[in-house]
Amino acid sequence: MTRRTILRGATIGAALPLIGAPLVARAAEIELKYGNNLPLSHPLNIRSQEAADRIAKETNGRVEIKIFPNNQLGGDTDMLSQVRSGGITFFTPSALVIATLVPVAAINAVGFAFSGYDQVWKAMDGPVGAHVRQAIEKVNLYAFEKMWDNGFRQMTTSGRPIESAKDMAGLKIRVPVSPLSIAMFKALDASPASLQFSEVYSSLQTKIVDAQENPLPIIQVAKLYEVQKSCAVSNHIWDGFWFIANGRAWRGLPPDVQKIVAAAINDAGVAQRNDIKKLNETVQADLQSKGLAFNKTDPNSFRAKLRDSGFYKDWQERFGKEAWDLLEGSVGKLA
């Protein structure tokens, strides 16, 4: 957060954001910079713009949020550093990104923890989310109450369909560079390979790996249906975005402005969740029309395998008893 008199000197020559709050009759007293890594067309940016417009209106033009989408301000690591230093006010990292700073933030990505969105929001709008927000606050960041949706991850393969845990044995599958993801697939007896996303298509094409896992919109955009035959609706990991603010900047806002900003951002986050649900339904139909076959999976077989392998017990110890008990209170017994 900066006052206009400070910002004017600091931003001469900087790239202008593609979107921001609407023009108001007078100059804003408070300017807030928000960076993210998604394109303008993504529901996160559409709803963020709505929140920015609402905030400008409800503060009578006192507050302007400038939105810098699509990695304009750098990658996730860069923006996480900037929001910590106060270079930007807001950032929306995925839980797995902020977990590099706050490890317990990755707890929502425990494999096969959630049976569906009802359990996700019960946990993340409830005690699990509150626990993570407290941990985020300890590193001088403020996390808004409502988490934004990044979707469930699904598995695709070029060979036989994945229907139960036994189908994972020996499967060469690309996974992101995440200790939690790597550990889960190893526990399922697969052979996970950590590759940059830019390498996924060619690696599938050349059979370096036979499978991969991502949310459906990513599978669509990357045209992975061209090199994969089937998609298992596994919902094996859910990830979301935390809308976070620099702690000092947030505390420096007048109380009335805090109230308006928090309400607008939380309401926008809830609306974005429904957008993602509708988007996934549309994307699945499109992928099916392009020849990607979909099949259901047996989640109980995966949970049993992870339990028997000691995966859940190991991560219970890593996350700590308090956080794990809160998770199991929302989803049932895992370890």
Residue ranges and their predicted role:
Residues 2-19, 24-119, 127-335:
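N-terminal secretory/targeting leader peptides
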